[in-house]
């Protein structure tokens, strides 16, 4: 595979994190994992040159029910419009600020499926941005840097377990599906990639906790990974009786599961509410 940044007459732009998928075997495997069906409400993030877009449109789109796509590169938008016409509804803009809820069906029930080969340089902030739309999302299938996927699905007590693990596992059930080597792209990235499936927890499965408070607690815990929680969460001792909570502070952040972080966040929020 050539290392050239040019593919199909388009130069991949580093500032957009562009690496175009060209391996048809991988594309077929991704489409098989997504299983798009006619009439579904689906949006693709960063369609690029349309390698995944075309096969998905063939299974999903009709003139009255197009595939939606969010694309920042205006050069690509013109090419995509010319190629797919009314079967693709393009939204020109940055996925990091895009209102994905605007594409969901009215009523607030899960109706939206999100797919994409996410730009690796913005993957973590984009995943956090998408969390706010989880109530209207059926599922998400993303190509990501393998190291990010490993952190997303990591278990407590492992080196890969991180703030990203806790926050995403709180909101989604996630599975790593497919490993994708660098040579599947043009130009090849310097890292391995993987496909991950993310299914939001149903509302009745979600713990009653303020996500902002949970994020605050988890961020504090992981702020100094090698230090004990007595140091990183020590500032909450005025609010939380950790002994009464059965929470051992003589551990490190990566040793604590999602449920325990939720309990601490609930205690913090309760203490603040009671003044």
UniProtKB/Swiss-Prot annotation:
<feature type="binding site">
    <location>
        <position position="19"/>
    </location>
    <ligand>
        <name>S-adenosyl-L-methionine</name>
    </ligand>
</feature>
<feature type="binding site">
    <location>
        <position position="21"/>
    </location>
    <ligand>
        <name>S-adenosyl-L-methionine</name>
    </ligand>
</feature>
<protein>
    <recommendedName>
        <fullName>Ribosomal RNA small subunit methyltransferase A</fullName>
        <ecNumber>2.1.1.182</ecNumber>
    </recommendedName>
</protein>
<dbReference type="InterPro" id="IPR020598">
    <property type="entry name" value="rRNA_Ade_methylase_Trfase_N"/>
</dbReference>
<feature type="binding site">
    <location>
        <position position="71"/>
    </location>
    <ligand>
        <name>S-adenosyl-L-methionine</name>
    </ligand>
</feature>
<dbReference type="InterPro" id="IPR011530">
    <property type="entry name" value="rRNA_adenine_dimethylase"/>
</dbReference>
<keyword id="KW-0698">rRNA processing</keyword>
<feature type="binding site">
    <location>
        <position position="46"/>
    </location>
    <ligand>
        <name>S-adenosyl-L-methionine</name>
    </ligand>
</feature>
<dbReference type="InterPro" id="IPR029063">
    <property type="entry name" value="SAM-dependent_MTases_sf"/>
</dbReference>
<feature type="binding site">
    <location>
        <position position="94"/>
    </location>
    <ligand>
        <name>S-adenosyl-L-methionine</name>
    </ligand>
</feature>
<dbReference type="GO" id="GO:0005829">
    <property type="term" value="C:cytosol"/>
</dbReference>
<comment type="similarity">
    <text>Belongs to the class I-like SAM-binding methyltransferase superfamily. rRNA adenine N(6)-methyltransferase family. RsmA subfamily.</text>
</comment>
<keyword id="KW-0694">RNA-binding</keyword>
<feature type="binding site">
    <location>
        <position position="117"/>
    </location>
    <ligand>
        <name>S-adenosyl-L-methionine</name>
    </ligand>
</feature>
<keyword id="KW-0489">Methyltransferase</keyword>
<keyword id="KW-0963">Cytoplasm</keyword>
<dbReference type="GO" id="GO:0052908">
    <property type="term" value="F:16S rRNA (adenine(1518)-N(6)/adenine(1519)-N(6))-dimethyltransferase activity"/>
</dbReference>
<comment type="function">
    <text>Specifically dimethylates two adjacent adenosines (A1518 and A1519) in the loop of a conserved hairpin near the 3'-end of 16S rRNA in the 30S particle. May play a critical role in biogenesis of 30S subunits.</text>
</comment>
<dbReference type="Pfam" id="PF00398">
    <property type="entry name" value="RrnaAD"/>
</dbReference>
<dbReference type="GO" id="GO:0003723">
    <property type="term" value="F:RNA binding"/>
</dbReference>
<dbReference type="InterPro" id="IPR023165">
    <property type="entry name" value="rRNA_Ade_diMease-like_C"/>
</dbReference>
<keyword id="KW-0949">S-adenosyl-L-methionine</keyword>
<keyword id="KW-0808">Transferase</keyword>
<dbReference type="InterPro" id="IPR001737">
    <property type="entry name" value="KsgA/Erm"/>
</dbReference>
